[in-house]
Regions:
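Sec-type signal peptide cleavage vicinity
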Residues: 2-8, 19-303
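Hydrophobic alpha-helical targeting segments used for export or membrane insertion
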Residues: 10-15
């Protein structure tokens, strides 16, 4: 599972509970069915780093509904309730369990990708970036009740995206790019994600990457390879990227003058020359490529 575009609306249906003997929506005891809609902040990264404008057919999100200060809402537990998508694009609908709201104030959040094995402690969900899966979270909406049953959640990215725009310079070989890896003192491979607010804990470093690319590099246009990473902050922002080209490994040390933040994309222009790799600048943007650019210094390592 894995994401560059504007907000996409995905309406979730199947939340309306109808009494068997009535054509009207149930309002017994002032209970009103929750109506849910979800927006995705920018793009979604799907499996194998394929970009998509929306959730695909059969995808599921996990929804939590709780009391204002309790895990239960009106005596019922709505923890990690799955809602599944049917159809695609603007015709997509979602179906899941009925959730009835009373006058008591409640709160809710959702996350993606859904896991039926989610830990009871949803503030520490294990994530391993070997799979290069995008994780989305909505944060809490704290204004639910039968007077405010229409719940809109905006899904945000918990990870940062690092994109390499690779092109061929004066390199005379075949220039077939088959893999890219990254490693660094603060580059996390695994960690614990709080799926309610997108925060991270217990981050452990390690190499992340993608293989089997089969990309033919050319002078123009540059070919993009994107990797997902746990956000990096503090002084240890430098990392090494290693590009496997024509069966050889070309390393280069990279960095940025600001933190690698969740929901942002950091685009490096990389040129393959006869003596190795060179970097031009890093462009820091939102997931949708609208942002600021800054020039950085990079230590070049030749093979």
């Amino acid at each position: 599972m894995r994401n560059t575009l504007g907000k996409k609306w995905i309406c979730l249906s199947g939340l309306v509970f109808c009494l068997a003997c009535s054509d009207e929506i149930a309002h017994e005891g002032n209970m009103t069915p929750l109506s849910l809609a979800v927006t995705i902040e920018n793009d979604l990264e799907t499996k194998a780093l394929v970009e998509s404008t929306s959730f695909g057919e059969g995808e599921r999100i996990g929804l939590f509904v709780q009391g204002a200060s309790t895990v239960e809402y009106e005596g019922s537990t709505y923890q990690n309730v799955p809602y599944q998508s049917y159809g695609t694009s603007t015709s997509q609908t979602w179906q899941g369990a009925t959730i009835l709201l009373s006058s008591a104030m409640g709160r809710a959040f959702a996350y993606w990708p859904y896991s039926d094995g989610l830990p009871a402690d949803y503030t520490k969900v294990p994530v391993d970036l070997t799979t290069q899966t995008d994780w989305l979270y909505s944060g809490w909406n704290v204004s639910l009740s039968n007077k405010q049953p229409n719940l809109t959640l905006t899904m945000n990215h918990a990870l940062t995206a690092i994109e390499f725009d690779v092109k061929r310079g004066d390199y005379t070989g075949t220039a077939q790019l088959t893999g890219v890896t990254m490693s660094g003192a603060a580059l996390g491979k695994t960690g614990k994600l709080n799926v309610s607010d997108g925060s991270w804990s217990e981050v452990a470093t390690g190499m992340i990457g993608v293989s089997g690319l089969g990309i033919q590099l050319q002078t123009s246009p540059a070919m993009a390879v994107k990797l997902l990473a746990i956000p990096i902050s503090g002084a240890e922002r430098a990392f090494e990227a290693r590009f496997t080209i024509d069966g050889k490994v070309f390393p280069i040390s990279l960095g940025c003058t600001e933190d690698y933040a969740a929901g942002k994309k950091y685009m490096y222009t990389i040129t393959l020359n006869g003596q190795g790799l060179s970097v031009g600048e890093v462009t820091v943007t939102g997931w949708t490529n609208s942002g600021i650019s800054e020039t950085i210094d990079a230590e070049i390592e030749n093979i």
